[in-house]
Amino acid sequence: MHGPHNKIWLFIALATVLMAINANADCPFVDIQSVNPTIVVELRYAGTKNFVNHPLYPQGTRALVRPEVAAALTKAQTTLRRYQYGLKIWDAYRPVSVQTKLWEASRNIDHVANPEVGVGSLHSWGVAVDATLVDSWNRPVSMPSDFDDFTPAAMWRYTGSSFEVHRHLRLLHWAMDRAGFWGMRTEWWHYTISDWKKFLPEEARQSAHLQGTHWKGKL
């Protein structure tokens, strides 16, 4: 599960990303699993396991991100494989139309980004993912909460979990941080590439600057 195989996957991922960038500069997103098939994908908004309790994505929707984000995810996956764990992606690129539906269903200004304010959700720019851990058999492991949890258990610094859950969360956060992601204090599963602002148009970058840091980001 580790050693030379991880290096091969990392090389393939980087090569795939470079080809994607060079092949079509006008199409900024790549399929995470086309870059690294070992990363598990379970898009929660393609099913009912989300806070609106019904699908928002059509069946067959792929997990898309910026090519640079896909390369960083492969780095995180390589780190986790050394410890017999791996990534599962719950969400990646999210169309503004879906973000609008989430906002209309919630109107929770503390947790859900209004797509018409500032930069909206960073998912809509392909620079953020929602991720959790799986074991070496791609089975889910214990984490502080499920996806789209608005209770204190979703907080990154929540202290009510067991030692095993804390260990899993620390491992996920460490691997993602090492790969170049920032976490979100209100959603342990949400990660944004640290240099996300450079992928936004100038006007959006100005809005992001006025909006604040990544710690104030929302779903």
Name the predicted role of every residue range.
Residues 2-10:
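Bacterial N-terminal signal peptides that target proteins for export
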Residues 191:
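Conserved metal-phosphate-binding beta-hairpin within the catalytic cores
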Residues 10-19:
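Bacterial N-terminal signal peptides
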